[in-house]
């Protein structure tokens, strides 16, 4: 008879088989009411799951991330039930959980409208209130295929046909609705109390463009209405900060259909781009990196040697010339090895740090493109360090310092660090993996950093550290990485002469601080809601004359500031001063310098900030000093000086 071990180490013994629900009820009525599922020996199961043997059991509630995912998954099924009741001819396909929500793909004869979404959501609320029990059943494969074909659900039948022969075919029933699913699910629809349908988008069946186009309905679901409301508020705030909207409003960049996934940078946006690029250039140059530049178009033979032709070909732009196949480079690493390979290298030459603002192209599906965040053409602040095994730890430690300086200078201080270790399928001896993983771990520990371990998540060619930023809305963005590579240098013939005269293959460290510059600028725009720190702002101050009498004075101030390398404009238009102030405030210019007859007489400027603060009258030299001091702080606040 089963003995159940609970998370606190206590044991409960039963003289008969029990369900997860039975155990929850034996612990307490409150837990039984809150229970959504169980985790039996680490495996997530329904509350109705029967336990016959001794196991370790955790009761899963909506305070558990798995519990929240179950709510979202079950809400996707609730949506499918509502769609079938309202649109019986619709076919149901797949509906997984995604970050903060879920989606379900449907095949239907016409596009779903906004009114349809409202009707579906209303029907979902009605079905949830009916509090249907959710039952799991195991079916025979042929019986399941026959049932779904009879119901007109061809996609479900196809899914079952493609499952491995040994796979258990389980279905879940709630009310009159029945759906194919591995589960687990919440025990009844009454547990689904806080959800919102968000949008409809197109999606190909199984993600293949030669398959049918389906309709994907996205939604979000939360344990309670308070959390839902907070999430919708964050979404609304994110919408205000959308870099695409701000990019148009501030005339920074645009995208158009003739070049999908590739940005057209306008003068002000390009100024931001150059400032970010130049910052990284100065930072890396000061840490011993040498900047290089490599070709955009490279013969397929190099990509075959590196392994990218076999593994990455679908994401490459390929062309042919004079009977030779070329690929526009999707990454820079094989080209950097070619630079390393020019000339004999000694152990005295290592570590060798090669950096490039490498322009890469990847043939991302058009449906995944999103402003600057997901593009087809991007520039990486890419670098590769060629070193010995014994140099890994110091190089990683130096890179960690570099990363944190950069993030702090850009105004980010909340960084999540993850160490990914060896997967089951890998190259290289275990002793080498031991050494590399220890070096990465030791570098993190010596820096006094908190980090998360991701066992088995490393690449097949080496372990890695990933750096993820949190922005002002609490969203996470994976940016920096340093990746140990035991494979590529050997594949591409990289060697060095060791101290004992033997030839050895160097270790290669792939590393980036920002990753895609385009994506990082999109993150910056949203983090600051377009109000970039003065050092990054495309226009740092604007001089505004009240009447034509101050025009010459305004031009002299503009000229003087520009001679100091500052980005200052003079707006001499014949417009009311209030209009000009409002316009430049909306453009998020950090400072507006108003000049009238009094300012001309006293050689001063009346300073206003984009936040609406009136700093009063300042001598031109005093404001110049203030602005230069603020720029020198970069993205750091006064308290960090």
UniProtKB/Swiss-Prot annotation:
Molecular function via GO: ATP binding; metal ion binding; threonine-tRNA ligase activity; tRNA binding
Top-level EC class: ligase
GO CC terms, sorted: cytosol
Region (Catalytic): 242-533
Pfam families, alphabetized: HGTP_anticodon, TGS, tRNA-synt_2b, tRNA_SAD
Alphabetical UniProt keywords: Aminoacyl-tRNA synthetase, ATP-binding, Cytoplasm, Ligase, Metal-binding, Nucleotide-binding, Protein biosynthesis, RNA-binding, tRNA-binding, Zinc
Signal peptide boundaries: none
Record text on subunit structure and interactions: Homodimer.
Name listed for the protein in its UniProt record: Threonine--tRNA ligase
Protein's organism: Alkalilimnicola ehrlichii (strain ATCC BAA-1101 / DSM 17681 / MLHE-1)
This protein's encoding gene: thrS
């Amino acid at each position: 008879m089963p003995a159940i071990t609970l998370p606190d180490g206590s044991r409960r013994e039963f003289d008969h088989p029990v369900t997860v629900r039975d155990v929850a009820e034996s612990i307490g009525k409150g837990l039984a009411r809150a229970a959504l599922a169980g985790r039996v020996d680490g495996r997530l199961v329904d509350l109705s799951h029967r336990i016959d043997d001794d196991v370790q059991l955790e009761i899963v509630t909506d305070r558990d991330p798995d519990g929240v995912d179950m709510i979202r998954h079950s809400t996707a099924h609730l949506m499918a039930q509502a769609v079938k009741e309202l649109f019986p001819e619709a076919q149901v396909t797949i509906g997984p959980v995604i970050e903060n929500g879920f989606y379900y793909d449907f095949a239907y004869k016409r596009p779903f409208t906004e009114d349809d979404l409202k009707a579906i959501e209303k029907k979902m609320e009605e079905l949830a209130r009916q509090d249907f029990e959710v039952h799991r059943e195991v079916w025979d494969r042929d019986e399941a295929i026959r049932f779904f074909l009879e119901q007109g659900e061809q996609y479900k039948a196809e899914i079952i046909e493609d499952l491995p022969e040994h796979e258990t075919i389980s279905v879940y029933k709630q009310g009159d609705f029945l759906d194919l699913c591995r589960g687990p699910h919440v025990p009844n629809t009454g547990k689904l109390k806080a959800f919102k349908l968000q949008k409809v988008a197109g999606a190909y069946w199984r993600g293949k463009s030669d398959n049918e186009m389906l309709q994907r309905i996205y939604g979000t679901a939360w344990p309670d209405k308070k959390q839902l409301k907070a999430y919708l508020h964050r979404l609304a705030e994110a919408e205000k900060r959308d870099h695409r909207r701000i990019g148009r409003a501030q005339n920074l960049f645009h995208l158009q259909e003739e070049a999908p996934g590739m940005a057209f940078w306008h003068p002000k946006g390009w100024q931001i781009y150059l400032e970010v690029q130049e910052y990284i250039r100065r930072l890396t140059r000061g840490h011993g990196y040498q900047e290089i530049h490599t070709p955009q178009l490279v013969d397929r033979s190099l990509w075959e040697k590196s392994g990218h032709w076999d593994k990455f070909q679908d994401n490459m732009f390929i062309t042919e010339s004079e009977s030779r196949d070329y690929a526009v480079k999707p990454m820079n690493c094989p080209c950097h090895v070619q630079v390393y390979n020019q000339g004999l290298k000694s152990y005295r030459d290592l570590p060798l740090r090669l950096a490039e603002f490498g322009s890469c192209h990847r043939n991302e599906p058009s449906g995944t493109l999103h402003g600057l965040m997901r593009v087809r053409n991007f520039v990486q602040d890419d670098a590769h360090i060629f070193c010995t095994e014994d140099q890994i730890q110091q190089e990683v430690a130096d890179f960690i310092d570099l990363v944190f300086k950069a993030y702090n200078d850009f105004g980010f201080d909340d960084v999540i660090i993850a160490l990914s270790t060896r997967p089951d399928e890998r190259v290289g001896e275990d002793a080498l993996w031991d050494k590399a993983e220890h070096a990465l771990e030791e570098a993190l520990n010596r820096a006094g950093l908190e980090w998360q371990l991701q066992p088995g998540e490393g690449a097949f060619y080496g372990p890695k550290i990933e750096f993820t930023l949190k922005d002002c809305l609490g969203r996470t963005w994976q940016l920096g990485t340093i990746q140990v590579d035991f494979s590529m240098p050997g594949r591409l013939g990289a060697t060095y002469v060791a101290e004992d005269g033997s030839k050895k293959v160097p270790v290669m460290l792939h590393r980036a601080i920002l990753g895609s510059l385009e994506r990082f600028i999109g993150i910056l725009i949203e983090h600051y809601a377009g109000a970039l720190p003065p050092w990054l702002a495309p226009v740092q101050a604007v001089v505004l004359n009240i009447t034509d009498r101050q025009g010459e004075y305004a031009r002299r101030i503009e000229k003087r500031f520009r001679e100091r390398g500052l980005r200052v404009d003079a707006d001499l238009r014949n417009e009311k001063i209030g209009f000009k102030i409002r316009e430049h405030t909306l453009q998020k210019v950090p400072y507006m310098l108003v000049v009238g007859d009094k300012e001309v007489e006293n050689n001063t400027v009346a300073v206003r900030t984009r936040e609406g603060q009136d700093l009063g009258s300042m001598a031109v030299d005093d404001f110049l000093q203030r602005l230069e001091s603020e720029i020198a702080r970069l993205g750091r606040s006064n308290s960090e000086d």
